[in-house]
């Protein structure tokens, strides 16, 4: 599903509601990931394994076509991308701390980190949209 198609599939009210929920959740988890003293590496590994599981389950569900399985995948997707948001925020902080001069390497790391967080936000938004959009069909 592309971002343009959501305006055809969902109402403006649902899109707005889900966007606000996503923004709040994303901001909170990015803040937690950035400020926590705990090492989130194990959370990142767990979330990555969950992401692989989501991909496999989605492919299987293409053949099965179960709406219940789709809902379960969506809830797991939300949990995975919440975890990845916190992990990626902490990872960016640690990577940029290793480049105190702020040179070209730091700019490349910042760009890659921004892309990771962008993908976390978009995927979190899409999974939440699938959950909330289902309730209003």
Model regions and ranges:
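A hydrophobic alpha-helical transmembrane-helix feature that marks the membrane cores
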Residues: 1-137
């Amino acid at each position: 599903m592309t971002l343009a198609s959501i305006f055809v599939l969902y109402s403006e009210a649902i899109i707005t509601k889900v966007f606000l929920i996503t923004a709040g959740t994303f901001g909170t988890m990015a803040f937690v990931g950035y400020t926590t003293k705990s090492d989130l590496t194990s959370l990142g590994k767990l979330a990555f394994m969950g992401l692989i599981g989501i991909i496999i389950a989605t492919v299987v569900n293409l053949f099965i076509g179960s709406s219940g399985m789709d809902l379960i995948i969506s809830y797991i997707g939300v949990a995975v991308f919440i975890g990845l948001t916190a992990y990626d925020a902490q990872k960016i902080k640690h990577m940029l701390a290793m480049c105190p001069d702020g040179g070209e390497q730091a700019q490349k790391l910042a760009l890659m980190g921004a892309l990771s967080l962008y993908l976390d936000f978009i995927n979190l938004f899409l999974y939440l949209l699938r959950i909330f959009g289902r309730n209003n069909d």
